[in-house]
């Protein structure tokens, strides 16, 4: 009897662990989305063309970049098809350094990208989290796609906070 129970627990543990990982990913992607949108909203509309130096993306391009990469990463991780790009974003994606993205478009695109990522994470199975997925030139598990691009979002959100401070604006407080 004890042996059967131990075998059952040993075989069940990976499933419990994966569920916990998935739940943590879902929680933190949601928080990251809300925080990133708050940072996006902190810049006034007329600041969306601001760039601290000529080599940097402007604020609107930076927000669109975060959202576009979210769609790619969450699609690769989950296998869900990416939603169609809004017309202004499709135009921007053809020339990311020359086409500006206004605040309303950028914030809506960010919101849509995080909504898509919420659905993608919810659709993940333990097998998909462990499987190598996505394009052949990127050997990442589903978990790695989500984690790598969670940190990508954090990196660029931090960059956006510097843009705000350079403009004399106070970014929203950290959320975790």
Model-predicted segments: where are they?
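Boundary of Sec targeting at the N-terminus
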Residues: 16-18
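Short, contiguous alpha-helical
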Residues: 26, 30, 34-37, 47-92, ...
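Acidic/histidine-rich alpha-helical segments that form the ligand environment
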Residues: 94-133, 144-152
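N-terminal signal peptide c-region/cleavage motif recognized by signal peptidases
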Residues: 12-14
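Sec-dependent signal peptide recognition
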Residues: 1-8
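Membrane-proximal, proline-rich intrinsically disordered regions
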Residues: 43-44
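Well-ordered alpha-helical scaffold segments within catalytic/enzyme domains
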Residues: 35, 39-40, 74, 116, ...
């Amino acid at each position: 009897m004890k042996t059967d129970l131990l075998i059952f627990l040993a075989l069940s543990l990976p499933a419990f662990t994966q569920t916990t990982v998935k739940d943590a990913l879902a929680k933190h992607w949601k928080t990251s989305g809300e925080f990133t949108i708050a940072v996006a909203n902190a810049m006034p509309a007329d600041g969306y063309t601001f760039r601290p130096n000529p080599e940097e993306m402007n604020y609107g391009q930076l927000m669109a970049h975060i959202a576009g990469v979210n769609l790619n990463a969450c699609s690769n991780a989950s296998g869900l098809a990416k939603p169609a790009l809004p017309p202004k974003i499709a135009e921007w994606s053809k020339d990311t350094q020359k086409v500006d993205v206004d605040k309303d478009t950028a914030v809506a695109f960010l919101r849509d990208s995080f909504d898509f990522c919420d659905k993608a994470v919810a659709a993940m199975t333990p097998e998909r989290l462990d499987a190598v997925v996505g394009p052949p030139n990127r050997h990442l598990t589903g978990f790695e796609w989500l984690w790598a691009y969670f940190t990508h979002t954090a990196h660029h959100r931090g960059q956006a906070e510097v843009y705000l401070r350079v403009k004399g604006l106070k970014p929203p407080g950290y959320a975790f």
